[in-house]
């Protein structure tokens, strides 16, 4: 299924039903009073989060949504039926922006959570309500109000505990495959991962969600490659893993590669740059010898001061220990 994380849709809530003008007409009641009922309220449109939905693709092909109108009132003080509300099902983590103001107006962050997008029009009033001591046969009524109209942009930001960051072919997809049941495509060419993938990592009785996004390249913060579009999915992660290929096939310098990604991250968002971040040195199985020494030299060259982890995602070496350490960190954050 194609991953869609941003769409623009038009919403029209239902119109309220008109009030009714009616008079009681029964045998032996020659002067029956007014009995016109009220109309029904128009239907509203809501956003509803569903943890089983992963993309906004359904809204890419259908762009206009209408809630049901309220029915008009009837005689004998019968109220019109209210229009049915319409629920648009979206992934957890979907935000809503008003197109006219470009301001965020709401979001749904938990399974089953709802958010009203547009309100249905109020019902019209029947002539029963206008009877008075001076007007026993009123012909006055009110029309139902128009429903609210709005054009909105839906944006999906994935909800993950841990996000993977790195250059294309750093081994992020292999890592998420090795510690979870996620199955992103893996191959020896750039941008094998075209869309974000989520995987649930289980550690004993605990579990956390890991997200793999397409690799970041130089200029990603300005829109180069796939980086800008998907960097936003890191914003809600509780921590970030910067995955570095210690032995790239391209024979590029791992030190330069590390700083290239860090630079793009800082340019994109200072808030994202300030998130807890851990260094993961991957593909240590490709080092001929002195693995520990070479990794230590790399860490010293980049001036990294925090905890770092050496792994071979392809051989599943060090990945279990990495998962345990991440789980310990996340448990302390709760």
Curated annotation (Swiss-Prot):
Positions of GTP binding: 166-173, 191-195, 212-215, 282-285, 312-314
GO molecular function: GTP binding; GTPase activity; magnesium ion binding
Broad class of enzyme this protein falls into: hydrolase
Domain of life where this protein originates: Bacteria
Keywords noted in UniProt: Cytoplasm, GTP-binding, Hydrolase, Magnesium, Metal-binding, Nucleotide-binding
GO biological process, one term: ribosome biogenesis
Xref: SUPFAM superfamilies: Obg GTP-binding protein N-terminal domain, P-loop containing nucleoside triphosphate hydrolases
Localization: Cytoplasm
Gene3D superfamilies for the chain: GTP1/OBG domain (2.70.210.12), P-loop containing nucleotide triphosphate hydrolases (3.40.50.300)
Cofactor: Mg(2+)
Occurrences of domain Obg (ranges): 1-159
InterPro entries associated with the record: G_OBG (IPR031167), GTP-bd (IPR006073), GTP-bd_Obg/CgtA (IPR014100), GTP1-OBG_CS (IPR006074), GTP1_OBG_dom (IPR006169), GTP1_OBG_dom_sf (IPR036726), OBG_GTPase (IPR045086), P-loop_NTPase (IPR027417)
EC number of this enzyme: 3.6.5.-
Sites where the protein binds Mg(2+): 173, 193
Single GO cellular component term: cytoplasm
Positions of the OBG-type G domain: 160-331
Chain's role: An essential GTPase which binds GTP, GDP and possibly (p)ppGpp with moderate affinity, with high nucleotide exchange rates and a fairly low GTP hydrolysis rate. Plays a role in control of the cell cycle, stress response, ribosome biogenesis and in those bacteria that undergo differentiation, in morphogenesis control.
Similarity annotation: Belongs to the TRAFAC class OBG-HflX-like GTPase superfamily. OBG GTPase family.
Assembly and binders: Monomer.
Protein name per its UniProtKB record: GTPase Obg
Gene: obg
């Amino acid at each position: 299924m194609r991953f869609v994380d941003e769409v623009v849709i038009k919403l029209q809530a239902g119109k309220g039903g008109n009030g009714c003008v009616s008079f009681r007409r029964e045998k032996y009641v020659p002067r029956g009073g007014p009995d016109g009922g009220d109309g029904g309220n128009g239907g509203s449109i809501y956003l509803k989060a569903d943890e089983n939905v992963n993309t906004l693709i359904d809204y890419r092909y259908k762009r206009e949504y209408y809630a049901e109108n309220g029915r008009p009132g009837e005689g004998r003080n019968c109220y019109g039926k209210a229009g049915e509300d319409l629920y648009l099902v979206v992934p957890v983590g979907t935000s809503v922006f008003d197109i006219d103001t470009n301001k965020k107006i709401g979001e749904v962050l938990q399974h089953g959570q709802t958010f009203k997008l547009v309100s249905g029009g109020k019902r019209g009033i029947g002539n029963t309500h206008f009877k008075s001591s001076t007007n026993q046969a009123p012909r006055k009524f009110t029309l139902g109000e128009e429903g609210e109209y709005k054009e909105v942009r839906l944006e999906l930001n994935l909800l993950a505990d841990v996000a993977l960051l790195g250059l294309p072919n750093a081994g992020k997809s292999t890592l998420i495959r090795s510690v979870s049941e996620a199955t992103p495509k893996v191959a020896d060419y750039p941008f094998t991962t075209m869309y974000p993938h989520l995987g649930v990592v289980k550690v004993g009785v605990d579990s956390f969600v890991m997200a793999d996004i397409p690799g970041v390249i130089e200029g990603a913060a300005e829109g180069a490659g796939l980086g800008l579009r998907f960097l936003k999915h890191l914003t809600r992660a509780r921590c970030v893993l910067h995955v570095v290929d210690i032995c790239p096939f391209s024979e590029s310098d791992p030190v330069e590669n590390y700083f290239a990604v860090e630079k793009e991250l800082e340019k994109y968002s200072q808030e994202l740059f300030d998130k807890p971040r851990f260094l993961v040195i991957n593909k240590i199985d490709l080092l001929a010898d002195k693995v520990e020494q070479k990794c230590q030299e790399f860490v010293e060259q980049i001036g990294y001061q925090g905890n770092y982890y050496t792994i071979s995602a392809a051989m599943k070496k060090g990945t279990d220990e990495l998962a345990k350490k991440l789980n310990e960190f996340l448990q302390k954050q709760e």
